[in-house]
UniProtKB/Swiss-Prot annotation:
It comes from Syntrophobacter fumaroxidans (strain DSM 10017 / MPOB). This is ATP-dependent Clp protease proteolytic subunit. One of its GO terms (biological process) is protein quality control for misfolded or incompletely synthesized proteins. Cleaves peptides in various proteins in a process that requires ATP hydrolysis. Has a chymotrypsin-like activity. Plays a major role in the degradation of misfolded proteins. The gene is clpP. The active site is at residues 98, 123. The lineage of its organism: Bacteria, Pseudomonadati, Thermodesulfobacteriota, Syntrophobacteria, Syntrophobacterales. Fourteen ClpP subunits assemble into 2 heptameric rings which stack back to back to give a disk-like structure with a central cavity, resembling the structure of eukaryotic proteasomes. GO terms for molecular function: ATP-dependent peptidase activity; ATPase binding; serine-type endopeptidase activity.
Length: 202
């Protein structure tokens, strides 16, 4: 079990203790630092909805360092990002692979960021098939449908032609931060918070 740091703050009412993720949430920062599971997705969705209810006109900042995970869980986060009113800016630190890369690209155009030494990876959805032949066929068809959906999302957010997306995601496709910027996955590469324009943090 991982250790979650506690932050203690002084106020007029005395000391208040927050776990680090709750403290970040006060600054409208959501941090994805694990694989994407149903449980993780539900927490992130709840945070997105909470921040929308707090202020529907203020940006939400979504920081990502994730190897990816369940496609259906990731799509639930993606749909919520598109559904809510606030702009969701995304920032990759470390890695954004598979479904996490899709979430990175899904930030609002112009506010998708990466740090200099990130690794971003795209590939087609994977699944282990077992059971009777008809069951395997059904599962294979579902994987193909998911692949088509994910490719359409990448086309929408990167501006790349679907033929290129299909070709690039056929196998693991790695990008540096600068390559991801050229590809249309992110808009800016930052080495320091000081280099972020005020408009990027609003």
């Amino acid at each position: 079990m991982s250790l979650i740091p506690i932050v203690v703050e002084q106020s007029s009412r005395g000391e208040r203790a927050f776990d680090i993720y709750s403290r970040l949430l006060r600054d409208r920062i959501i941090f994805l630092g694990t694989a994407i599971t149903d449980e993780v997705a539900n927490v992130i969705i709840a945070q997105l909805l909470f921040l929308e209810s707090e202020d529907p006109d203020k940006d939400i900042h979504f920081y990502i360092n994730s190897p990816g995970g369940l496609v259906t869980a990731g799509l639930a986060i993606y749909d919520t990002m598109q559904f809510i009113k606030p702009n969701v800016s995304t920032l990759c630190m470390g890695q954004a692979a598979s479904m996490a890369a899709i979430l990175l690209a899904a930030g609002v155009k112009g506010k998708r960021y990466a740090l200099p030494h990130v690794r971003i990876m795209l590939h087609q959805p994977m699944g282990g098939f077992q059971g009777q032949a008809t069951d395997v066929e059904i599962q294979a068809k579902e994987i193909l449908k998911l692949r088509e959906e994910l490719n359409d999302i990448l086309v929408r957010h990167t501006g790349r032609p679907v033929e290129q997306i299909q070709r690039d995601t056929d196998r693991d496709f790695y990008m540096s931060g600068e390559q991801a910027r050229e590809y249309g996955m992110v808009d800016h590469i930052f080495t320091s918070r000081l280099s972020i324009l005020p408009s990027a943090t609003s």
